[in-house]
Design a protein with these regions (language model features):
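Bacterial Sec-dependent N-terminal signal peptides
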Residues: 1-28, 302-304
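Extended soluble regions of mature proteins
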Residues: 21-304
Length: 304
């Protein structure tokens, strides 16, 4: 009888170890849903009527997280739809909205767990760049357009825009939990408060972003590196946008699928910022201050 019991315990132990090993690699599918008008309104951006008419009422993008015991990668899946039936098209505005998908846009993110490193790989001006990054909480570059982009701007005003004061950030961890893809997730609410002028009156406006994370997978990750508090983030929910894990499949993942390409050109955050500022100057000049103007410039992958 004792031998039978020990044999059963041995089988259960082996099964438990095998199951644990199985859950150290796999693929998680994410879906990002964006309501552009609500998203821009939440950031205080005044939308011209012509631009609003071209906006889809909602846009969906898909992303995939691949992970194994040592590395992970997060990148867009080539399948996008919007409520206007534009499929993968949607014109310039559709492409612009996809550039904000989960803050991933057309970027690829590569993680190494041992040293907690994160790099971003993206194309800009026909060149593939790689930039050192990291998980952090930075609501200024979070889910909204933020930064005063297009906010109450006069197209004929060539003066240097006034600096925008950074928002006040408060993180509230609640006792709430919910199941996402069979994993227990905990809630952290990020409250971002900034001063805005509404109807010629200065008011404090607070945006809330709900982050749902799990510690069951054993590694740190967020579909938006600027919206991370701890653990593996499986859902980010804000006004007018959300990114949520829809499914998880535990399977073998090769190292080459989660390793950054070696031929990309290195770029620092400061160099990237300078390039983007120069691009925005050309963008405003070509389009007379109108997003998506005559120059047709589309800027992808904000949130770096």
């Amino acid at each position: 009888m004792k031998k039978i019991i020990f044999a059963l315990l041995g089988v259960l132990s082996i099964a438990s170890v095998a199951n644990a090993q199985k859950k150290t690699s796999g693929a998680i599918q994410f879906e990002t849903t964006i309501d552009p008008a609500a998203m821009m309104a939440a950031s205080g951006v005044k939308i011209p009527e012509q631009m609003a008419a071209r906006m889809p009422s909602s846009s969906k993008s898909n992303f995939e997280l691949l992970f194994n015991a040592t590395n992970a990668s997060y990148m867009p899946v080539e399948e996008t739809e919007d409520s206007n039936g534009a499929g993968g098209g949607g014109g310039g505005m559709g492409r612009m909205m996809r550039g904000f998908g989960g803050a991933g846009g057309n970027r690829e993110y590569y993680y190494t767990f041992a040293d907690k490193k994160l790099v971003e790989v993206f194309d800009l001006s026909d060149t593939t760049y790689v930039m050192q990054s990291g998980l952090k909480l930075n609501a200024t570059a979070g889910l909204g357009f933020g930064g005063g982009m297009g906010r109450n701007q006069n197209p004929n005003d060539t003066t240097k825009p006034k600096p925008v004061a950074p928002p006040k950030i408060e993180v509230v961890k609640t006792d709430a939990t919910k199941q996402i893809c069979g994993l227990t997730c905990h809630e952290a609410i990020v409250k971002s408060t900034r001063s805005m002028k509404i109807l010629d009156m200065d008011r404090d406006v607070t945006e809330e972003t709900h982050i749902w994370y799990t510690t069951d997978l054993g590694f740190d990750f967020s579909p938006n590196p600027n919206m991370w508090t701890e653990g593996t983030v499986l859902a980010i929910e804000g006004r007018g946008n959300s990114t949520v894990a829809k499914s998880i499949e535990y399977r073998s993942v090769s190292n080459k699928d989660v390793t950054a390409p070696k031929k990309a050109t290195p770029i620092t955050e400061a160099e990237y910022k300078t390039k983007m500022e120069n691009m925005m100057k050309r963008f405003r000049g070509n389009g007379n201050g109108r997003p998506g103007g005559a120059g047709g410039v589309v800027i992808r992958g904000f949130g770096g």
